[in-house]
Amino acid sequence: MNTDFVYTFPPLIPGILKRRYKRFLADIELESGEMITAHCANTGPMIGVCDAESQVYVSKSNNPKRKLAYSWELIEVDNTWVGINTALPNRVIKQILEQEKLPHLKGKYNKVRSEVPYGKDKKSRIDFVLTNESQQNPIYLEVKNTTLAKDKIALFPDTVTTRGQKHLQELMDLLPDAQPIMLYFINRGDCQQFSPGDDYDPGYGKLFREAVKKGVEILPCRFEITPQGIRYLGLADLKF
């Protein structure tokens, strides 16, 4: 067992992507020749990570209540595996936080809470709140899955996201009573840098720069994705 994985996949099944459609669905030809329809958890445009005839991996659930037994997990892009399952980043980050495996935050907290209400009228939920009895200001941490890349630079977002803009504004509104952090989960191992996706959502890019100036901390976390598991590679350089 490889102990440097922060997440280990169950046995995955190789195949070839035939098409992705209706946002949630992907037709895949398995190595055995069987054609299946898998669930696609990523409902965004998936720019550059849903090309037909690409190598992919799927997982299979034994839950009889599931409409689709297979879930699309990975795709190969330019000899790099990219994570497709958008449910994974938060699970991985939660595990890393609970095991204190994120060096940047090590020793700054001793309690992790998930999906905590915050913001105006407590109608929003932050992914994680980290607290420490000896620390006055709690850490509020939001996670964003990042798969788009251009010239080895990871970019977020890949489309206009009013929800993402709202999250940036709400993190700014926490200052100065909390330490807000936006963590970008770079779901591919080939990017050394991170930038806001200005070409895809200029409004987000503007808010991103405002957030940095006001004191929102940005953690662009690099991960290597393999069919066996996920490794943490450290922080990407910010470029903006």
Swiss-Prot record:
InterPro entries: SfsA, SfsA_C, SfsA_N. One of its GO terms (molecular function) is DNA binding. Transmembrane segments: none annotated. It comes from the Bacteria. Pfam families: SfsA (PF03749), SfsA_N (PF17746). Belongs to the SfsA family. HAMAP family: SfsA. PANTHER family: SUGAR FERMENTATION STIMULATION PROTEIN A. This is Sugar fermentation stimulation protein homolog. The lineage of its organism: Bacteria, Bacillati, Cyanobacteriota, Cyanophyceae, Oscillatoriophycideae. The gene is sfsA.
